[in-house]
Every structure is written in C-alpha cells, then in structure tokens.
A protein has these predicted regions:
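Short loop/turn motifs enriched for small/polar and acidic residues
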Residues: 55, 82, 228-230, 299, ...
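Hydrophobic h-region of N-terminal signal peptides that target proteins for export
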Residues: 8-18
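Substrate-binding groove of N-acetylhexosamine-processing glycoside hydrolases
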Residues: 29-32, 36-39, 46, 54-55, ...
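Acidic, contiguous N-terminal accessory segments
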Residues: 19-145, 354, 361-362, 379
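A generic structural motif
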Residues: 74-88, 132-135, 184-191, 410-414, ...
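Feature activates predominantly on carbohydrate-active enzymes
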Residues: 97-338
Length: 510
C-alpha cells in the first residue's frame, strides 16, 4: 500500500523533496574555506520557519542578516542574536558557519565576519529539486571554520568610458561576495569633478553623487572603495595605444597643464598644474567618503619634454616634491597614499630582472627617501608580460619590504602566477595582495582571474570540482555573477553574462 501511494505521488508530480534521497555535492565556495565538512545526505532548508542564530558582538549584525535574507530569498527568518565573540572565529574577518535541519548558526567577531559567513551560506545553497518554478533553497548540513591569511585583499578595477555604471556596480558587488575587503577604482576620465570638469568626458557617469552611493553600497557589503587618480604619468586618462587624451582632445586651452610630448605626464614645473592635481585629489577623496587609502598611480611616466621641467636637474626633485605634497595633503585627511612601484627602480638594473623597472637613476633614489607610510603596489604579471609564473625569488618585493614599506604584490591574468604571488605574500609577511584586472573584465579570463585571486588572497586552494570543471558556464563564477544580477534587478540583455553580446556582428555576417 505504501509503495502504491508513493508511486501515485510521483506520477502526480507532487513528490516532496524532503522524502527523497539526496546526495549533495561538496559545496563550491569562492574563496575556498580553510575548514569545511558536510553531510551529503542531510538537507537543510532555507525557509521562513528556520531558526537562525547570529553570534557577534556587534548588535547590528542581526538586522543586516535579516535584510539580506529579505532581499535574497523574499522572507525573514527567526533571528536570535548572541552578543559575544564567536567561538572558533579568528580575527576581524574570520567566521564560523554551522547548518543543521533545526538551526543555522552564523558567527563572527565583527559585522564583516558575519557578512562573510552569510555570503558562504548563500553560495552553498542550491534551488530545491521540485516543481516548475522555484519553491525554495536547500544545502547540505555542514560546518565551516574560516579565516583569511592576508589582511589586505584587494582588487583593482578600471572604470573606462565604455563601461556602464551598472557593470561597475556588478564588479564591486562581486568583489565583496568573494571576500575582498578593498576595491581600488581607477577613473579613466569618468569622474565628473565639479571643480575641474574638463578632466572627464562629457556626461561622465562617476559623479560626486554616484561616488558617494557606490562607496556607501560597498561599505554595506563589507568592502572599502579606494579611488585612484594618476598624479604623474598616465595623465591622458586613456590607454597610450588608443591615442586619446581625455582633456586635450576637446579642451586644447588646458595644454599648459601637461607635458608637450603627447600630454602623457602632468607638467610638474607648472604650479598651476600641480595645484589642479591636488584640488582634484581632494575632491575625489571627499566624494568617496574619505577612505583610509588613495591610489596615486605614478607608473610608466615619460621623461620630461617640457623645457622648464627639463631645466630642473635632477627631474626627480620635481617628482618627489609633487608626490610628497599629495601625500601630506592626504595624510592630513587621514589617508595613506598607494603608488605603483616601477618608477622607484632604475630601468636596466639587472637586480630587478624579470621584474619591472621604469625609473631613472635619480628617481630610483626616491625609494630611500619617501615616507614609509606609503603603500607600494609592486605589479608583476608573470608569463603574460615577459616574465615567468614562478620566479626564483621576488627581489623587488623583498627590496621594498626591507626598506620598511607596506608592500602589496599585484598580479594580473596569469592564473599560476596569481597563486604563486599570493603564496609568497603570505609566506613573506607582505601587507597583502592587489589583483589587477585592467581591460580583461569580460569572459572566461575575467572569471578565472577573480576566482583564482580570491583564493590566493584568502589563503586556501580551490577544491577539485573547481579545478577540473572545463565549462565556464558551469563554474561557480557564472552562478555568482548571475546572483548579483538578481540583486541588482538587471534585465538588460547586454548587462547579463560575461559579454555584452553572444556573438559579434562580424560573426553574424560570415
């Protein structure tokens, strides 16, 4: 009799998932947790009847968790707050997560630790296998103890004129979801300064209001936005190979602010030019909510072409004075400057091979005299930029750390190199890691960079499912990118997926 009733229920399409056998796969989490155990045959459901215990000294943790549940799942569970440090959670960003059929426990020593626990819970949960439309979510019973190996876990995004505000927000949300705690956002002529509007494109999307909104959103999600403005080279606000100059192409009256040979450098002998830079930095730092860091670029600068700049010998005196002025200005505002490393190393010096050195002999001396509260961002791109994924040593990182600087290793799009550099940052006790993305913000490469960098900065290797899955559409990044799209209410086809379109016009015309 029982067997016939069961068959009737199945035939009628109302077979209840709770009565079925289940065999959950290992939860696929980015970044991979340090300790994770789970029971493949024990489902835990997320529904309005569940009991959720939040252990955290910060009383606002319960309200944040309740709000996220409402946004993600459409219901608010019963939440019990225990206002004490979470047993097993280490440091400010560590967390614990326990899921059982009768209750789920999220714990952290800070609100951000609780946020990380909830992000992990969401990544572990899957839709229930019943019905034609979504009925709910479930996950295997599990226990997780997790803590990051690096304090500074950053990712560097560029906001090009071709990027939409929606896409940039999508990236910022993803960074928080992957437990990066800093996002450096470099404006490529898109910050609409109210004091100096000619330094941006017409209808620039990154207004002061938008900067404030994104900074507040990022903070709520657990990540700090750090603005970047290039105060030395890269003054064009565009890639050199594109031949564009954000200001001079449209506003030739501002030529005195830039070097005459292409306008790549700011004219550092012109006090009006350096004043404009400082005013712009001040405005941008304020717009982003006065974060604790500000990135000033300072990479890949040209030799001076301006006759008054060339008359100053050595030219490095102008450069150092300019950097110090901006550093002092931001220090007074409670912030430390970050800068790329390459102009602080003499090009051609064999000690630095295969790493990058673009400075003159005199500019290289600045490394010994600049204040040690500057954060050095040492970029090295492995086998995709004239180097190797696994160099025998990291002489430049060791050099700057030995001089007393807080030093970040900054990989790019070499997955093996990302892993190795993250490991070295942990073993050498560096300040942290800053993953760079540049123009590779779409497709499989972007997915690989983000997953790999999140793991490397956190300090755990990805599980076998993620290493061996050949399909980008099946990898966790695809699901996570889509989840964030749901959170944002994205419905525009061009804003979904990894590319703006499925195929390009030239493919369709073949």
């Amino acid at each position: 009799m029982k067997k016939s009733v069961m068959l009737c229920l199945m035939a009628g399409g109302i077979w209840m998932a709770g009565a079925a056998d289940v065999a959950f796969r290992r939860p696929v989490i980015v970044p991979e947790p340090v300790e994770l155990t789970y029971e493949a045959g024990q489902p835990v459901r997320l529904d309005k009847h569940m009991k959720l215990v939040v252990t955290c000294p910060d009383p606002s943790a319960a309200a944040w968790v309740s709000r996220m549940f409402g946004e993600w799942y459409g219901f608010v569970p019963r939440v019990e707050i225990v206002k004490e440090a979470a047993a097993g959670a280490k440091g400010a960003d560590g967390y614990v997560l326990s899921a059982r059929p009768d209750r789920i426990v999220l714990g952290g020593n800070t609100l951000r630790g609780v946020k990380y626990a909830l992000y992990t819970l969401r990544q572990a949960a899957e839709r229930e296998s019943v019905g034609r439309t979504l009925k709910g979510y479930w996950l295997p019973a599990l226990d997780i103890k997790d803590t990051p190996a690096l304090d500074f876990r950053g990712v560097h995004f560029c906001w090009f004129p071709e990027n939409s505000a929606t896409f940039i927000e999508h990236q910022i949300r993803l960074a928080a979801y992957y437990k990066f705690n800093y996002v450096v956002l470099e404006s490529w002529g898109v910050f609409k300064s109210e004091r100096h509007p000619y330094l941006a494109i017409k209808d620039a999307p990154l207004t002061v209001k938008e900067a404030r909104r994104l900074s507040a959103l990022a903070a709520d999600l657990g990540v700090t936005l750090i603005p970047q403005f290039n105060i030395f080279g890269h003054a064009a606000g565009s890639r050199s190979m594109g031949g564009k100059h954000i200001t001079l192409d449209v506003h030739p009256q501002y030529q005195p602010l830039f070097e005459p040979a292409g306008g790549w450098n700011w004219c550092l002998s012109n006090p009006d030019a350096t004043a404009v830079v400082r005013e712009y930095v001040d405005e941008m730092h304020e717009a982003f909510g006065r974060p604790p860091f500000f990135h000033v670029g300072c990479d890949e600068a040209d030799e001076p072409s301006c006759p008054t700049c060339r008359a100053v010998q050595p030219y490095a005196k102008l450069v150092e004075a300019h950097i110090l002025a901006v550093r002092d200005q931001l220090k007074a505002r409670g912030a430390r400057i970050m800068m790329w490393h390459d102009m602080l190393l003499e090009r051609g010096d064999k000690r630095w091979r295969p790493f990058y050195a673009n400075g003159s002999k005199d500019e290289a001396k600045m490394a010994e005299t600049l204040p040690r509260d500057i954060v050095i961002c040492d970029w090295y791109y492995g086998n995709n930029y004239g180097g190797t994924s696994e160099p025998k040593s990291y002489s430049t990182l060791d050099y700057f750390k030995g001089l007393g600087y807080s030093t970040l290793t900054c990989p790019w799009n070499d997955p093996k190199g990302i892993v190795v550099q993250g490991r070295y940052a942990r073993e050498a006790g560096l300040f942290g890691m800053l993953e760079t993305v540049w123009h590779h913000f779409r497709g499989n490469r972007f997915a690989t960079m983000m997953e790999t960098a999140a793991d490397a900065a956190w300090g755990a290797a990805p599980n076998g499912v993620r290493r061996t899955n050949p399909s980008v559409g099946s990898r966790p990044f695809a699901v996570h990118w889509r989840q964030i799209g749901w959170d944002m209410g994205i419905s525009d086809y061009a804003e979904t997926g990894f590319y703006d379109t499925t195929v390009t016009r030239d493919v369709l015309d073949r």
